[in-house]
Amino acid sequence: MKNILKILILILICINKINCLDGDGKQFRMIMLLSANVNDMGFNNMMNQGRIGVSKNLQIEDSRLIVVDGENDTKALVEPILQNEDIDFVICSSQGHTVACKYFADKYLKHPTVKTQFLIRGSGSSTANLIQFNYNFASCNYMSGYFAGLHTKTNKIGFLSPGAPKVNDAWVYAFWLGAKQVNPKIQFFYYNVGAFLNPDASERATNDLLERGCDVIGNTLDDFSSGITIMSKGYRTIGTNGFPQKLIYGEKILYSYAYNWTKLFLPIAMSVKAGITNNTNGYGDFNLDESKNFFNIEYSYGVSTDTINRMNQQITFLKSNSRFTHPYYCNEYLPEYTKKNNLNLSTSPTVNNLICIDHSTFLKINPPFPGMTYLGIYNISLVEVEFSQSIQNGFSITTGILIGITILMMIGIIKYSKTPSMRSASPIFLNFILAGGIIVYIGIIVWVGPMSTHSCNARLWLVTLGFSTLIGSLVVKNFRIWLIFDNPELKSIKITNYQLFPWVGACLVINIILMAILTSVGDLKQIDAMNIDSLGKYEYMKVCKMNSSGASTLYTILAYFAALLLVGVFVSWKIRIVDILEFNESGAIANTLYAISFCLFVIVPLMISPQDMQSETIILCTTGLFITTAALLIIFIPKFWRVFRKGANDSEINFNKKKSSSVATARAESGSKGSNGNASSGNRTNRRGNVVSGDFTDDSESSVGDENQKEKEKIKDDVANVTSGAVLAEFTDEASDTDNNEFNDIELSEQPPSIIVNDSENNN
């Protein structure tokens, strides 16, 4: 008994294998091409259901699904498969595959090895390897409109279609006619959305139709985005894309029709598997023979019995009559419409002498009939996402306040320019530094302002020129201090402001040249950017963009600023030996560079990490404000504080001496030895040598035990008094006896007693 069961199982397995083979005894291979993914819950999903149904009925193991659309993409993807694999049957489901599949059929019609047969959308003649199929899309849309006319409560219905050039609006006309036949009072509105699959446009267009009062909305789209939008508003809807929506959404679907592609594809696939090349086309429609009936109709419990009965009566009428005499081909509106739009009426005789059009003329219907309200192509308007107005106002107000403070500082410098604290720092260069800060502030206001090509260029020009002016003036004026005080030979040096102006100008000229290159070759302009940051699909933001040449130039500008900062570091390090606080700005420069370095330490990781444009702008502008404001405060607060502490009317050249550096001491000692020569030179020495040795060193430590120490200290202080006044004159370019910095040896007793040098360690 067990042996008999084993034999029966083997026989069944063999029969199953034989059924999977075609007439030549090889495995049957089938491919279906889809224009979109099967999860559209519409046309493509139902096509795939047809493939599955054929595969089950014919027990096809190698049944593939390929998503591709368009002639070129279809050729590129499918042809290698045809050449390298023995494919028997290809179903080209979409009109986007038609041209490519016809090309394959013609190319391989008499090919010795490629015996593939192709099933394409159309109604033309068949060949040995080309079969065409179609379905009556007019009849299902006519019946959907018929239902809409029966069910509407507002007498307003709507429709969505792809529209030309994808497809003419003949199907829209069929829907409208169905409603018009049963409800002459109907008002009809429709949109084109540009494609069979455009959920964004269909959702927005559906909302518009709902706002117009439409309570039933149909469509000829591939997906169910319109129906989902309607249900999200709390309404029930109809399913008009060939998918049995009631299976998913239940009683929210008032009415739907579903395609049964298995009934259409199965006879054709059986013929191909049997090796028959005398092919005939396939067509899907309402049919009295249920095995051939292509459409399955379903209703919700909310639909009245009267509506269902009238629907069934009309469907029976369509099944019982030739489709060429159906109402959408033959009605009283056609004569006037065809005449107006240069279309032809059918000349074929019909029953009861009906006035009709043929199918080719039907497909040319596109302009609306009287009573159809065409709302046009629904274009989704792009929405600009603007920079936050509150942030923009915050930056602008803050920067405006800082500009006002900076202007007050400039006025203060002019007012107190005669005070030692200001005179020693070169007032004209102080104002240059402040002017550079104002330019940077203006650039930041432009940076957060409305975006345009002009503002994209202006903000870079302003910010770079501002920093060049600020940093360049700071470096150049302190370069003069270094040259005067870092003087091992203790020679008299005169450097006027007019001699320094070209150096500041050179810093600006370099900046201008680099920015001119960026402007000319960088193609810096404002563009409307989409798909950036967290923007929606139909949102855009105005941003500044430059090409690679512009980016390279910008990096060069940044390198130039880095070099300028390095020079500033060098100068600040060199002037650290200056013992007079008014002339020593090494601390201010160092603190400014520290602030810049701190910002770079924070900003670089932030800029490298993903940032949206608004966050990037906030970071850059905040950094620019901080660097500029910190630099100005670090440089100018001590100066104004000294003016406040000493008094605005202080006429004394009252310098503060800080603790001497070891470098200054060493240089002073070297200078003293070179200038004294021997003991006989006594008290007559170079005055600048004396001031360096006396004011910039701590000689009390090196001369302990000298019985004349107190007298020497007095002599050095007196010499320092005269030379300090001379040095101050060099920084102000004022006409005086010391402007040329050339001093004759005079007796110490001749020094003016009003010039005082204070030791900062003993003077608070």
UniProtKB/Swiss-Prot annotation:
Residues listed as glycosylation sites in the UniProt record: N72, N260, N278, N344, N379, N547
Q: Identify the stretch annotated as signal peptide in this record.
A: 1-20
What does the entry give for GO biological process? G protein-coupled chemorepellent receptor signaling pathway; G protein-coupled receptor signaling pathway; response to bacterium
Kindly report every residue range on the membrane side named Cytoplasmic: 415-427, 486-500, 574-587, 639-764
Q: Which GO terms describe its cellular component?
A: plasma membrane
Q: What topology does the record note for this protein and the membrane?
A: Multi-pass membrane protein
| Segments in the Extracellular topological domain | 21-393, 449-464, 522-552, 609-617
Q: Which InterPro entries match?
A: GPCR_3_C, mGluR/GABA-B-like, PnrA-like
- The source organism is Dictyostelium discoideum
Query: Acidic residues composition bias: which ranges?
Result: 731-748
- Recorded name of the encoding gene: grlH
Q: What is the taxonomic lineage of the source species?
A: Eukaryota, Amoebozoa, Evosea, Eumycetozoa, Dictyostelia
Q: Give the protein's recorded name.
A: Metabotropic glutamate receptor-like protein H
